[in-house]
């Protein structure tokens, strides 16, 4: 047989063998196109598991009439134009093959309108040469793609489709993954005329946990530990489930994204597994929803036909970065909580209200229960939040679901040794260790609190500063030092070097480890609260402060560091506020008894109440 150029339809069908595996593959490609077009709402209609109909409608920017024919051509795209673009891809699609491949194995119709056009246009390809026909149509700004009779002209491919239910489950899973990647987009999914999923867009902040719970379930939400980890151009955020409470059902939740693109990457999975291996059994798997952001120049996404895998230019650095981030939040969660004081605890005691609220609703009343091993969460670093705080981000959280959280809080820790009965005291004494219930957030950084009928305002940045100081101040043992993935090397003067050497023992108690030579100092480890700070700014400022001191007390240094740390929250959510106050109540009980003026201010409602009654 002589060498010959294949007809366009046959060439597209060959390409479709890589891109279009099943109906879910079509949905993935088309929804990603909608996201690249800037859509904020995407409606997906499926019939018979996608074999009969796949319809994707969005409100994106649309496609111009003159470009509709090109949109259905192979290797035609608006997302890259040069090799430099290919090496720094930020869009989800870039090859320009999807529409041509899909149209070659189905009856595809593309209808679109841009904001500049007065009318919409419809395009479809047919025949051996895939000639494109364009005609007027009625359509709002945006694009609709209809894929009818998938694999109608390739019986062998159609024969390998599974049952309608199985194929739709694959589509449902794809939409779940996409919904987790884009919290700012409303996505609805219908099957055979019935709405099956509806994920509404949520703003930044605590509302994200609402969608997380809707997609991954309350079981994952209960055990979710938040991660915020950064180094240079690398950022890791998301949630990982507490390995001590991972179940086979939870282990199915393994979602990872690189620059917003869903991935199944062995390197990432290995790093997460390695971080959790000491807490997981041999037959257990970690559960996680993680987002890795990296300089697009440092990752190659053009290595897999369906773009499910990537190749990192510095794979070892990425692996260790993810490993350190996950390990850090797990170690923090498993730390032994510090006692509130040396006095014995009363037998029946009130749970701090913010912890009860975390399990039921925002306005839960104080609850009294028998003493059990408390599931205290360590102070959060880098924005991480204990599992019990997540439901507070969900307005109108259902009471029945809250029962699960209350049972979780009342479950004794298995390793805790039973204590002998102690004298009972009124529960009101323990309740004095609580600031009260968080009602709402005011002016983005103040919490409105209610306690015993009294209203007060609490400054969240000030509370965060006190918490950081408590975390940094060494107790009977020094603060745990966290090795830096990449040590920080700084040039110092002779005076600064002398001050550092004098303060070395005090800094070691704070978890700051360094090594100095003739003109440089290398910071090798810092305490956990400093890991997410910009150390290239903070450490030189700390060295300058030490150079002006004659006495080096760990407490004074911890106070200075706490005052100079950058807040991780430009705008606070309810969940973050409740978590913060719960940790302040645990580590800084003296602030509850005698709060400083800059932390807490009472709000007098009596004049307003009197004015209302006088009316």
From Swiss-Prot:
InterPro entries: DNA_mismatch_repair_CS (IPR014762), DNA_mismatch_repair_MutL (IPR020667), DNA_mismatch_S5_2-like (IPR013507), HATPase_C_sf (IPR036890), MutL/Mlh/PMS (IPR002099), MutL/Mlh/Pms-like (IPR038973), MutL_C (IPR014790), MutL_C_dimsub (IPR042120). Residues 362-397 are annotated as: Disordered. CDD domains: HATPase_MutL-MLH-PMS-like, MutL_Trans_MutL. GO terms for biological process: mismatch repair. The keyword DNA repair applies. GO terms for molecular function: ATP binding; ATP hydrolysis activity; ATP-dependent DNA damage sensor activity; mismatched DNA binding. GO terms for cellular component: mismatch repair complex. It comes from the Bacteria. Signal peptide: none annotated. Keywords: DNA damage, DNA repair. SUPFAM superfamilies: ATPase domain of HSP90 chaperone/DNA topoisomerase II/histidine kinase, DNA mismatch repair protein MutL, Ribosomal protein S5 domain 2-like. Residues 373-391 have a biased composition (Low complexity). It holds the Pfam family HATPase_c_3. Gene3D superfamilies: 3.30.230.10, Histidine kinase-like ATPase, C-terminal domain, MutL, C-terminal domain, dimerisation subdomain, MutL, C-terminal domain, regulatory subdomain. PANTHER family: DNA MISMATCH REPAIR PROTEIN MLH, PMS, MUTL, DNA MISMATCH REPAIR PROTEIN MLH1. Belongs to the DNA mismatch repair MutL/HexB family. NCBIfam families: mutl, PRK00095.1-1. HAMAP family: DNA_mis_repair. This protein is involved in the repair of mismatches in DNA. It is required for dam-dependent methyl-directed DNA mismatch repair. May act as a 'molecular matchmaker', a protein that promotes the formation of a stable complex between two or more DNA-binding proteins in an ATP-dependent manner without itself being part of a final effector complex. This is DNA mismatch repair protein MutL. It comes from Escherichia coli O1:K1 / APEC.
